[in-house]
Structure formats: C-alpha cells, structure tokens
Amino acid sequence: MATLFIADLHLCAEEPAITAGFLRFLAGEARKADALYILGDLFEAWIGDDDPNPLHHQMAAAIKAVSDSGVPCYFIHGNRDFLLGKRFARESGMTLLPEEKVLELYGRRVLIMHGDTLCTDDAGYQAFRAKVHKPWLQTLFLALPLFVRKRIAARMRANSKEANSSKSLAIMDVNQNAVVSAMEKHQVQWLIHGHTHRPAVHELIANQQTAFRVVLGAWHTEGSMVKVTADDVELIHFPF
C-alpha cells in the first residue's frame, strides 16, 4: 500500500482539463491508497465555504467518495485556499491539518506543509501572509457580501500576479536555512511540500544526517504526486 500526496491543482472553472484529470485520479489511484494528503492550493481561489460555486460542490462530492471508500483524506491550507473551512471539510470528508504536520510513515518521520512559509526571502509576500492570516481580518472578510468578496479576491489575484512578475525566481523559491530550521525543529529526515511549482527531490544535511526535500509539481499540463511506500518515496508525474 501507499500514502499519496498532491498539491497545487489550482482548480477553477477556466481549467476543465485539470478538473477532469483530478476526478480520474480520485476515481482511480486515490482509491488504492492508505491515505491521501492534499497540501494546499487545491483551488485557485477560496472566498468562503458559502460560495455556491458548482465546482466546489462537485469536488467535495468526489473527495467524499474517496473518504467513504475507506481512504482517509487530509488537507493543509495553501496560499490560495487558506480560507477553506470546516463546512467544506465536512462536506468533502476531509480532515483539516495545521500548517506543519509530522507523519510517521512506514518507518520514516516526514514533515508535510504547503511550503509558502519556507520562502522567507520574499519579504513582501511574508508580510502579506501575516496580515491575511489574522483571525479578526478573516472574520471581517467572511462577513462581507459574497459579491464584495469576489471583487476583493479578483483584485488581490491581479495585484499578486503583477508583483510576482517583477520578482526574481530565487526570491520566490524556498530559503535553504528555513528548510533546515523546519526539519531540525521537527526532527525529521523527510520534508514534502508544494507551492513553488518546482518539482524535484533535493538532498541536504539536517539533524546532522542526510535528509530529503521532495517538492510536488503543479497540475498544469500533467498530474504530480508523491507516493510513499515502505520501500520508496517517489515523485511521479502522469498524464491527466
């Protein structure tokens, strides 16, 4: 058996091929797993569990079917869907996890997270993240009418796209010291995350031993998952 990890699908109505590919994944590979972990940015945007978007309900039903089949499903918030709440979690049968979670998998101690907190060189983003994660601000935003939230979210995405276009690729990648610090804090040899859209397996030194950072790819033109078994940790890309 295997435990599966995915991230950065950025599901939206404008990308039906990705949605179709995810549905096939849920109906196939996911049903064979010991567990499925979604490490953030499942959706391109999330403005509240009360959003009647048909795509959200379609995805909730599909994930719930996996959960009901006996495969537990877990979710860590990303930078796009950090407002996804308990209502959607119940509807989809997912368990919400904290932003950093340590798993014991087949004899390995593995830290999982979305990955944006590791990009500490991007000071502008980290300041923005700290602001929008304030509970009082989230409560205020979610109390606004849905049409107002949609306008704010659209403007924020446009501003983010403009800001990122002028940033260097290095700034938007993880900071190596932040990686080592997180792994040593949790005393792990393995780290699995998404966010950067730079799929790879990196070898490093943490806790005075060889350690590994596995980065999930985004679902742009193909699927990406990490498959952990008793024998191996594999980064796998597959057609939709």
Swiss-Prot record:
Task: Report the domain of life of the source organism.
Answer: Bacteria
Q: Which residues bind Mn(2+) 1?
A: D8, H10, D41, H197
Pathway linked to the protein: Glycolipid biosynthesis; lipid IV(A) biosynthesis; lipid IV(A) from (3R)-3-hydroxytetradecanoyl-[acyl-carrier-protein] and UDP-N-acetyl-alpha-D-glucosamine: step 4/6
Q: Binding positions for Mn(2+) 2? A: D41, N79, H114, H195
Key words, A-Z: Cell inner membrane, Cell membrane, Hydrolase, Lipid A biosynthesis, Lipid biosynthesis, Lipid metabolism, Manganese, Membrane, Metal-binding
Q: How is the cofactor bound?
A: Binds 2 Mn(2+) ions per subunit in a binuclear metal center.
Per the entry, what this protein does is: Hydrolyzes the pyrophosphate bond of UDP-2,3-diacylglucosamine to yield 2,3-diacylglucosamine 1-phosphate (lipid X) and UMP by catalyzing the attack of water at the alpha-P atom. Involved in the biosynthesis of lipid A, a phosphorylated glycolipid that anchors the lipopolysaccharide to the outer membrane of the cell.
Question: Under which name does UniProt file this protein?
Answer: UDP-2,3-diacylglucosamine hydrolase
The scientific name of the source species is: Escherichia coli O6:H1 (strain CFT073 / ATCC 700928 / UPEC)
Source organism lineage?
Bacteria, Pseudomonadati, Pseudomonadota, Gammaproteobacteria, Enterobacterales
